Amino acid sequence: MQRDEKLFELTLDTVLQRLNDLKLAVLSMIQKLELEYETINWPTFLDNFAIISSHLTGLTKILAKEQCPPLRNRTVLPLLVSMDRDDTLINITEGRVPVFSHDIVPDYLRTRPDPITEQKMLQNEQKAANLTNDAAMKQVTQYNKVVSHVLDMVSKAREEWEIESSSRTGIQQTSSMADTQLLVAAVGMGKGLKLTNYGPGPGMMVPPSIRAPSPMGGPAMSPGNVQQQLGKAPSAVKTNIKSANQVHPFSR
């Protein structure tokens, strides 16, 4: 008798520990859904769901062991029902149940489902029992047709996607990323360009200070002087010195 009681207490402790782990996993998942719904991604959600599933699997294995006493054969009876506030009960239930009253006992110590749920379950069981084999086979056949149709649609979409992906990889590349980067660097920052000094060409603009003289008079400048003037900065003060012996070309 004592051995059975010890085994029963050990089983209850293990079940309570698994239930606490399951509760923490569910709370963590609910917290992420409520607070991190904008940043949570699908892999993180699947990881949390896998943790909850592992806790449920472990709890099921504990209850399915042969050493575990059949808990369904035991009945939980309330020893004291009171309308007064119970601090110990609040601490055990983490603030969820402040009073162990007559209104709470049927909900927390219920060994059967709610009456509405139990009625729906009985209706479904009766409906399943009244179903004939021919009707069941027809429904199964129809269900298999729907599943096969959906599977064909998914397979066709997958084949089209694979064909499109393979055709994209076979297209010959007509541009070079390295050449494009060199061209952009040369145009934008002048990278790789060399600066050379040449005389003014026929299409280049020449500053007025070094422009060739007009027919009004004045000495012509050689290309060397023009290049020398191009290399110098123009003076801030402009002077115009004329010779006294210069004759106006139109004074005849």
Swiss-Prot record:
GO terms for biological process: regulation of transcription by RNA polymerase II. Residues 215-252 are annotated as: Disordered. Gene3D superfamilies: 1.20.58.1710. Residues 237-252 have a biased composition (Polar residues). GO terms for cellular component: core mediator complex; mediator complex. Keywords: Activator, Coiled coil, Nucleus, Transcription, Transcription regulation. Pfam families: Med8 (PF10232). Residues 215-224 have a biased composition (Low complexity). GO terms for molecular function: RNA polymerase II cis-regulatory region sequence-specific DNA binding; transcription coregulator activity. PANTHER family: MEDIATOR OF RNA POLYMERASE II TRANSCRIPTION SUBUNIT 8. Component of the Mediator complex, a coactivator involved in the regulated transcription of nearly all RNA polymerase II-dependent genes. Mediator functions as a bridge to convey information from gene-specific regulatory proteins to the basal RNA polymerase II transcription machinery. Mediator is recruited to promoters by direct interactions with regulatory proteins and serves as a scaffold for the assembly of a functional preinitiation complex with RNA polymerase II and the general transcription factors. Required for activated transcription of the MtnA and MtnB genes. Belongs to the Mediator complex subunit 8 family. Component of the Mediator complex. This is Mediator of RNA polymerase II transcription subunit 8.
